[in-house]
From Swiss-Prot:
Residues 1-21 are annotated as: Disordered. GO terms for biological process: symbiont entry into host cell; viral penetration into host nucleus. Keywords: Capsid protein, Helical capsid protein, Host nucleus, Host-virus interaction, Ribonucleoprotein, RNA-binding, Viral nucleoprotein, Viral penetration into host nucleus, Virion, Virus entry into host cell. It holds the Pfam family Flu_NP. This is Nucleoprotein. GO terms for cellular component: helical viral capsid; host cell; host cell nucleus; ribonucleoprotein complex; viral nucleocapsid.
Amino acid sequence: MASQGTKRSYEQMETGGDRQNATEIRASVGRMVGGIGRFYIQMCTELKLSDYEGRLIQNSITIERMVLSAFDERRNRYLEEHPSAGKDPKKTGGPIYRRRNGKWVRELILYDKEEIRRIWRQANNGEDATAGLTHLMIWHSNLNDATYQRTRALVRTGMDPRMCSLMQGSTLPRRSGAAGAAVKGVGTMVMELIRMIKRGINDRNFWRGENGRRTRIAYERMCNILKGKFQTAAQRAMMDQVRESRNPGNAEIEDLIFLARSALILRGSVAHKSCLPACVYGLAVASGYDFEREGYSLVGIDPFRLLQNSQVFSLIRPNENPAHKSQLVWMACHSAAFEDLRVSSFIRGTRVVPRGQLSTRGVQIASNENMETMDSSTLELRSKYWAIRTRSGGNTNQQRASAGQISVQPTFSVQRNLPFERATIMAAFTGNTEGRTSDMRTEIIRMMESARPEDVSFQGRGVFELSDEKATNPIVPSFDMSNEGSYFFGDNAEEYDN
């Protein structure tokens, strides 16, 4: 990409660092995950969790949510100012599951936010360690991406449910910073912008006054983030139009929806990082591993290696399939909800099935579910190979626009062709090419029409044996083309509701 010189790498965004060399980046990412691990160990001690209970992914999620809530400044301020019945603004908590005489019991715990903040800072050398918090947010976001469908959210903003592959990071909180912006899909950014424009249409003071000026700055910043994800001049030029609009309205919404559709073939660059549950880092730290000294990367072999030797458990409902639960968490760990299933299956070494065929609900257990019948099982999070995570959309010929697939945003940098039904996508582009953006629209449609599904993406890139940590011998898989690659086909997942 043209602006590569000024871009910071993921790890720099992740750790809030300026330009660093590879070793410094590995050390600062290591420091970040090491801090998460130390915090987790301390919380397990506070809560007197047994080793088994500390490895339970549901307990890990509760502890992660507590620290995110403790540091959520805006929400804390809001709760202070709008006291609601039964919510103590100074406390945070959630369900902790314990093993009692052969059964799992749920215990609701409550902690002072101040106390949680103290434990977190203490684990992070006295710093706020915002990077670690963002890392946890991205893990939760990746879990949501693998678990829930966003059809309703798409339809509400006037987008097509078939654009689900563009929705990575749609549940990330606004405060997730540069690292969060990097992992958001094109559809997510479009949706945020459309919501903003709609508010402006309905509330005439939205863009006015001192507040309106701040709103405008946020609007332009979001436009620039989205523009940076597009890889063709015409798509970027359209984003400039949207950003510079005096009074954003329906014309801009139309343009944004057009751009979102175009991203199904002319894919945007969206970052992928393997963010693991806090308990995994905790286990490693407890076993004496020094992340900062060894260094760590979110996009290389490290997360794969960590998962090879971590045993994590999950609660299982009576009619759920433990193997399916494992697949869900594996996909979340590697940010692979939008990856081609052929590629995921090859790397994992076991068949990864579409979500419609999974016999499992989400990982979290609702407070009204019956614990009597709950069982637990080991999550199988190991893989056969590892591959480098990508931050490109996998477009061919010199990273310019080319073949895409109606439902894939590649996670792994592995050679494959991108099957897509051009007719299906092009049908969405009939008609409207008039207006200010007509020449750009025409250009985008022309590029899409010339895309060939048989083109190969990530030419020559392969997966690596887990013993090949320096990535010296790429194994380039050959894929059976007849297979449909999308996780979302025949989808019957629950909607994501806050």
